[in-house]
Amino acid sequence: MQLVRQKEKFATKRRGTVCAVLAVLMAGAAASGCAAGEDGRAGGSREPVAGRPGAAAQKDAAAAEARRLKREQAARVAAARKWGLAKMPLAAPAPPAVKPRITTREGFEVEGGETLPPVFTTVPTKERIVFLTMDDGAEKDPELLRMMTELKIPYSAFLSDYVVSDDYGYFKDMQARGVTLNNHTLNHRYLPGLSKEEQRREICGEQDKLEKYFGKRPTLFRPPYGNYNGDTLRVARSCGIKAVPLWAAEAFPDHMEWREWDQDLHPGDIILTHFRGEEDWEGSMADMIRRVMKTVTDKGYAVARLEDYV
């Protein structure tokens, strides 16, 4: 409280009154414990100090969080060991509050493509992250679902109905585990060799199938073999496609293949692989994941979820 000095001619006659008022105020403040609070705000809210209930609650909460993080870390170490990973996968950073602006990669343009879905192989980011995508759906390995769930590795699926239709349940299980199911056409045909209407049946027909069996029309589309033309992108846009992610690298159980001359990963690169097994590969899908994660982790990258950025 600041005491304002009175003018001299009123000072004498009011001094006694002022003193009396001050005495009452000071006594009231002492009795009430200064209800306004030591920080000067109404209500007396302030940071708890040691020995008071608020401080104990904060300490307990911090300890509980530390225990939770320790359990999570132990579970990740155990999962990496269980699935034969030499190193524990690195954790991806939190997704951006605003998704980056995606544009078509230079050299991948089509005439009049300014308003068409962008075609790209890398997501613009400075984070050391990459994205794992799997195409077609031919191999339906239950071990893959368990492995990816326990390792907490995000991935995206691009499905073709002609190899998915014999077991929609497998992909419903995958979707329930947080995987986004995207469009890879009905029959995996070479799109530039088809008429516009034939392409429409392939692309929009797959949109209809995915909505019917999985409850959602995708916004991401990958053309078979990575081949497309202007009609492909115009048709895709007409049935709800917003972006066309291709790939910067392809993963196999025994090696990696690279698009770029330096044969390396870069921030935001998209990795392609397929739903395949030992009939087609020298190894299983689990072997392929081990290869991917060794490459990614050794190079200091984490796997992030594509749909958080696109």
Q: Residue spans of the language-model regions?
A:
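Catalytic domains of cell-wall/extracellular-matrix polysaccharide-remodeling enzymes
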Residues: 143, 190-302, 307-310
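N-terminal low-complexity, Pro/Thr-rich disordered segments
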Residues: 32-119
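Active-site beta->alpha N-cap acidic-glycine motif
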Residues: 90-183, 187-190, 209
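Positions that flank functional sites
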Residues: 39, 43-45, 163, 189, ...
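Secretory targeting and sorting signals
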Residues: 1-39
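Ligand-binding grooves and catalytic loops that recognize ribose/phosphate and carbohydrate rings
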Residues: 61-68, 74, 79-101, 167-209, ...
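Hydrophobic alpha-helical packing residues
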Residues: 26, 148-149, 174, 236, ...
